[in-house]
Regions:
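A short, aromatic-enriched beta-strand patch in the conserved N-lobe beta-sheet
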Residues: 15-17
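AlphaC helix of the protein kinase catalytic domain
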Residues: 35-45
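C-terminal lobe helix-coil module of Hanks-type protein kinase domains
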Residues: 32, 55, 61-62, 66, ...
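Flexible N-lobe loop architecture of eukaryotic-like protein kinase catalytic domains
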Residues: 6-9, 20
Length: 251
């Protein structure tokens, strides 16, 4: 699958095959970087800078989707960032080609392959995985990058409770999640940072994390457009016009 992808935001595949004892292997580009959440904590002190990094990730995922590939396992350890701030999407081990049946695979507690903390509702229901699944997972990643924690209050290691939250509960607001996050992981000026966790950003992430895949953005490019609108202080399509204070007033 990875051999189909040629994008600056996706780690290159050099070779692959099987060992003499039948074990699959592949060799890929070495990425001198760490998990995206660690990079944000160490280097990105503002909401805007973190949204710009999310746009890099979204562009890489858009490239995969244009090649009819869904990643299915978007999480911090699969998004590496080097010292120059260049994103590299790695580990397509759970990826699938759209329109092709999946080979039998190991599952999590009888479900399809996934990382529960970042899995979409349809993955817990064993429903088909589509581009909308990546959009949901990307939104959870964005929520973690921006707020410092996952979008639901329960413990993700409690599989049944987490599955219930993902399929039934609404996510917290970014500001509320930020308030509940670890103090040691917050930016140096938390009050200023929190002011920029606006309703527009909440609206974008909530749309992308809709329980029904059909209610999410129709494509990663559509979500990217709303994130770009946020950065440019323009209205986002995810939010209906209303009297609430928007981003422009928070600047």
């Amino acid at each position: 699958i990875l051999a189909c992808l040629h994008d600056s935001g996706i780690a290159l595949l050099f070779d692959g095959g099987e060992t003499l004892d039948g074990q699959p292997f592949y060799t890929m580009e070495y990425v001198d970087g760490g998990a995206v959440t660690d990079y944000c904590h160490a280097s990105l002190e503002s909401v805007d800078l973190r949204v710009r990094l999310l746009l890099q990730i979204a562009a890489a995922l858009s490239s995969a989707h244009r090649n009819l590939i869904v990643h299915r396992d978007i999480k911090p350890s699969n998004i590496l960032v080097n010292a120059e701030g260049q994103v590299k999407l790695v580990d397509f081990g759970l990826a699938k080609l759209l329109g092709r049946p999946m080979l039998p695979t190991m599952t999590h507690a009888g479900l399809g392959p996934m990382t529960p903390a970042y899995a979409a509702p349809e993955q817990f229901r064993n429903d088909p995985v589509t581009v909308a699944t990546d959009i949901y997972q990307f939104a959870v990643l964005g929520f973690v990058i921006l707020s410092g924690r996952l979008p639901y209050r329960c413990d993700p290691t409690d599989s049944l409770e987490w599955a219930r939250a993902v399929t039934e509960e609404e996510p917290m607001t970014l500001a509320r999640a930020f308030d509940l996050g670890e103090e040691a992981r917050k930016p140096k000026n938390p009050a200023r940072y929190r002011r920029h966790l606006t309703r527009d950003l909440d609206a974008v992430l909530r749309k992308a994390m809709a329980k029904d895949p059909r209610a999410r953005y129709g494509s990663m490019d559509a979500m990217r457009a709303d994130l770009e609108a946020f950065l440019e202080a323009r209205p986002v399509t995810a939010r209906r016009a209303g009297p609430e204070i928007g981003r422009a007033a928070c600047r």
